[in-house]
């Protein structure tokens, strides 16, 4: 299959919403600093803005501008780093840069350093994290193939990054970095 990575990066730079394979399902994403793109993503997904989104990245450095690490201990950060890259999402204190649409109007933001090779390439090529939510209409089954994304979301998204999902076959686990509380079973 021919890579369309550059086409996806171009769409992101133009403020468009894209779909891409992750560890367990296809994700929908956009530039986390583009409010119009985030609003479009929420509209496409039919997702309430107070639910928030995940930021997915190639490495921790991409996430740092969106985080306020001052209230996390070295031990708490070590727990987080021990799971990355991988299918583990952590809720951490947000910095002022994190959009309220990404945080769901909370003081925290959900973040993940992906180990999926295409997500790694996409975020590296784009130079920053992406918003991430499962590529499906709210309440519908998550999409696991390009064809399912096309069937469910069709012309509402600009481009789909060609590729296969990882072998997890379910969304990532979500935990609170401060308390370790399990927020979503992975």
Swiss-Prot record:
Q: Name one GO cellular component term.
A: cytoplasm
Asked if the Swiss-Prot or TrEMBL record annotates the protein with the keyword Transferase, the reply is yes
Recorded GO molecular functions are: ATP binding; double-stranded RNA binding; L-threonylcarbamoyladenylate synthase; tRNA binding
Tell me where in or outside the cell this protein is found: Cytoplasm
Pfam family for this entry, one: Sua5_yciO_yrdC
Keywords, A to Z, come to: ATP-binding, Cytoplasm, Nucleotide-binding, Nucleotidyltransferase, Transferase, tRNA processing
Q: Which Enzyme Commission number(s) are on file for it?
A: 2.7.7.87
Report the enzyme's class at the first EC level: transferase
Q: Which Gene3D superfamilies match?
A: DHBP synthase
Question: Taking every annotated instance into account, which residue ranges of this chain make up the domain YrdC-like?
Answer: 2-186
Q: Does the keyword Cell membrane apply?
A: no
This enzyme catalyses: L-threonine + hydrogencarbonate + ATP = L-threonylcarbamoyladenylate + diphosphate + H2O
State where it is primarily located. cytoplasm
Q: Biological process GO terms, please?
A: regulation of translational fidelity; tRNA threonylcarbamoyladenosine modification
Family (UniProt): Belongs to the SUA5 family. TsaC subfamily.
Q: Please explain the role this protein plays, according to its UniProt record.
A: Required for the formation of a threonylcarbamoyl group on adenosine at position 37 (t(6)A37) in tRNAs that read codons beginning with adenine. Catalyzes the conversion of L-threonine, HCO(3)(-)/CO(2) and ATP to give threonylcarbamoyl-AMP (TC-AMP) as the acyladenylate intermediate, with the release of diphosphate.
Q: Which HAMAP family match?
A: TsaC
Q: What is this protein called?
A: Threonylcarbamoyl-AMP synthase
Q: What is the lineage of its organism?
A: Bacteria, Pseudomonadati, Pseudomonadota, Gammaproteobacteria, Vibrionales
């Amino acid at each position: 299959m021919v890579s369309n990575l550059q086409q996806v990066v171009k769409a992101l730079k133009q403020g468009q919403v894209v779909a891409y394979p992750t560890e367990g399902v296809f994700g929908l994403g956009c530039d986390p600093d583009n409010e119009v793109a985030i609003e479009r993503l929420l509209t496409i997904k039919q997702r309430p803005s107070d639910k928030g989104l995940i930021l997915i990245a190639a490495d921790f450095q991409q996430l740092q501008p969106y985080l306020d690490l001052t209230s996390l201990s070295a031990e708490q950060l070590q727990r987080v780093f021990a799971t990355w890259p991988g299918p583990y999402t952590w809720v951490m204190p947000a910095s002022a840069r994190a959009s309220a649409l990404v945080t769901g109007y909370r003081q925290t933001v959900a973040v993940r350093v992906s180990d999926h090779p295409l997500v790694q390439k996409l975020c590296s090529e784009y130079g920053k994290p992406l918003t991430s939510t499962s590529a499906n209409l709210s309440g519908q089954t998550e999409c696991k193939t390009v064809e399912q994304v096309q069937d469910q979301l069709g012309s509402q998204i600009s481009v789909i990054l060609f590729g296969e999902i990882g072998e997890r076959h379910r969304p990532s686990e979500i935990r609170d970095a401060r308390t370790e509380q399990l927020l979503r079973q992975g």
